[in-house]
Amino acid sequence: MVSKHGTASSAQAKAEVDARTESRARAMLDEAASLAPASTNGDAELADQLSEKARVAWTKNGLLIPSTKLAEEWGITRGALDQAEEGYEVFLLKIRGWLWAPAVFAKLKRSAVAKVCRTMPSADEVSKLFFWMQPHGALGRKTPAQAIQAGQLERVLEIARGLAEENGWGHAEAN
């Protein structure tokens, strides 16, 4: 039986699986973005349907995990996760009546996720998800999660602040 922390080869295998999952997630985000029609009143219903279809796909393909799983991974109660969401420390997506969280959050410290999420409190959930999943040139083509894992939290915060300022998403608190 392999220990919880595994061996070097199991760590490498997990890293490869994580990389493939992240690659599929980016492809899904790109596909969803290409399907989204221009926003007009006549297209609003179609956009909602496409958005819902994409969101359901994200739950099936591992981009999102149930919020209860994130709470468990972070060692907190579901109520504490709700409070974190109210404090802009995390964001959740409601899909078909259930709350889902970005799977990458489970790989990161709660405090790091909170610092980044608080920089853009008024951004919509999909914009936040795209921020977390897209590689950024300023991060050496890494996603914010990859950059944080590589010790670049401060750089991720700089980029998040700039994006929030550019889009008028405001700040919940100074970081």
What are these regions (language model features)?
Residues 1-175:
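Non-transmembrane "mature" sequence context
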